[in-house]
């Protein structure tokens, strides 16, 4: 009887981080210097329209907010495959050829995802658009509130959940559902933000009481 092989962990094809124009002030600028890891070794090259193949294997779930229009985004793309070179931030329009285009600006409530992206570098599968049975790599963690919270308080919530050992058990079941909700409705994202913030408040109080006893 042949032994069943364990499924290999899905690894992202690229790490994608959206940056603002450097001349635009933002309250999150101090976080950039603290959270951005050093660039990987290799030759730095600018992103050109010909490098779209690097983006093609990075599925992103779109967030169709009617209040914001797609803008030219600054992208920092670090391919993880061998033989590929990292990429400098550039003002090229980023249109990933995966599940859709991630739309946001610095005024978007989605900005705290930058904080969670580097504090909680989780890699796990999500179900792509169409509810396919084949999971795809959640490359940039920008489509799910479990990985990319919509409120600064949510990073505290995720830390509390992880400290209680619940994160590995619940993230696989909730991630695809939250990604689906936030993809279809901006209002749903705001509601989820409020719910996660309340959960973060109560979990943080419980964690403090446990540590103080």
Curated annotation (Swiss-Prot):
It is found in: Host mitochondrion. Induction: expressed as early as 9 hpi. Its main location: host cell. Keywords: Host mitochondrion, Host-virus interaction, Inhibition of host innate immune response by virus, Viral immunoevasion. One of its GO terms (biological process) is symbiont-mediated suppression of host innate immune response. GO terms for cellular component: host cell mitochondrion. Plays a role in antagonizing the host innate immune response. This ORF is not present in other Noroviruses. This is Virulence factor 1. It comes from Norovirus (isolate Mouse/NoV/United States/MNV1/2002/GV). The lineage of its organism: Viruses, Riboviria, Orthornavirae, Pisuviricota, Pisoniviricetes.
């Amino acid at each position: 009887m042949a032994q069943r092989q364990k499924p290999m962990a899905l690894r992202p094809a690229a790490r994608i981080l959206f940056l603002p124009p450097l001349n635009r002030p933002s309250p999150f600028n101090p976080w950039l210097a603290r959270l951005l890891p050093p660039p990987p070794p290799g030759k730095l090259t600018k992103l050109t329209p010909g490098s779209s193949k690097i983006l093609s294997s990075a599925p992103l779930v779109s967030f169709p907010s009617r209040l914001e229009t797609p803008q030219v985004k600054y992208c920092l793309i670090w391919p993880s495959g061998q033989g590929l070179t990292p990429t400098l931030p550039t003002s090229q329009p980023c249109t990933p050829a995966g599940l859709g285009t991630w739309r946001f600006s610095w005024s978007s409530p989605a900005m705290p995802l930058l904080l969670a992206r580097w504090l909680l570098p989780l890699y796990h599968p999500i179900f792509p658009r169409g509810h396919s049975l084949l999971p795809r790599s959640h490359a940039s963690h920008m489509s799910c509130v479990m990985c990319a919270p919509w409120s600064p308080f949510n990073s505290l919530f995720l830390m509390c959940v992880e400290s209680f050992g619940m994160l590995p058990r619940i993230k696989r079941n909730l991630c695809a559902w939250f990604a689906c909700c936030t993809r279809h409705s901006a209002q749903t994202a705001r509601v989820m933000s409020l719910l996660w913030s309340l959960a973060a408040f109560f979990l943080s109080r419980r964690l403090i009481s446990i540590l103080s006893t």
